[in-house]
Swiss-Prot record:
Translocates 4-amino-4-deoxy-L-arabinose-phosphoundecaprenol (alpha-L-Ara4N-phosphoundecaprenol) from the cytoplasmic to the periplasmic side of the inner membrane. Keywords: Cell inner membrane, Cell membrane, Lipid A biosynthesis, Lipid biosynthesis, Lipid metabolism, Lipopolysaccharide biosynthesis, Membrane, Transmembrane, Transmembrane helix, Transport. The chain crosses the membrane at residues 45-65, 70-90, 100-120. Residues 45-114 form the EamA domain. Belongs to the ArnE family. This is Probable 4-amino-4-deoxy-L-arabinose-phosphoundecaprenol flippase subunit ArnE. It comes from Shewanella sediminis (strain HAW-EB3). Signal peptide: none annotated. The gene is arnE.
Length: 120
């Protein structure tokens, strides 16, 4: 598997972990009487931990090849993914300030990654 595919899988897994953490928080808010073990073994929390683990393992694969000084800033793509996901899945509004912010983030990612041979 190429390093770029590992990076994509890491970003996807990290975003999915955040998604399932939000789902877990929503479940716990809707059912405040859940006992700690019920929370610990709830489907959303288990999926969150699973995706967190996949993200960590694939990230280690990325770091074994790419310089952390270049790879880590590219993880800011997660901010963009989560903003859009929260809007379309959780119906959270996106302000003009947020649109400007994600545009700047994406410009930064393009600037950092543009034309560099380490992406291949």
């Amino acid at each position: 598997m190429t390093t770029f595919l590992l990076f994509v899988l890491s970003v996807f897994s990290s975003s999915m972990s955040q998604y399932w953490q939000k789902r877990a928080a929503m479940l716990f808010a809707m059912q405040p009487d859940l006992r700690p073990l019920q929370k610990l073994f709830s489907r959303p929390l288990i999926l969150s931990v699973f995706f967190l683990g996949v993200g960590a393992m694939t990230w280690l694969g990325v770091l074994s090849v790419w310089d952390v000084s270049m790879a880590y800033p590219l993880l800011s793509i997660n901010f963009v993914i989560m903003l859009l996901l929260s809007h379309y899945v959780f119906n959270e509004p996106i302000s003009v300030r947020q649109w400007i912010g994600i545009t700047l983030i994406m410009l930064g990612v393009i600037f950092l990654a543009g034309g560099e041979q380490w992406l291949i």
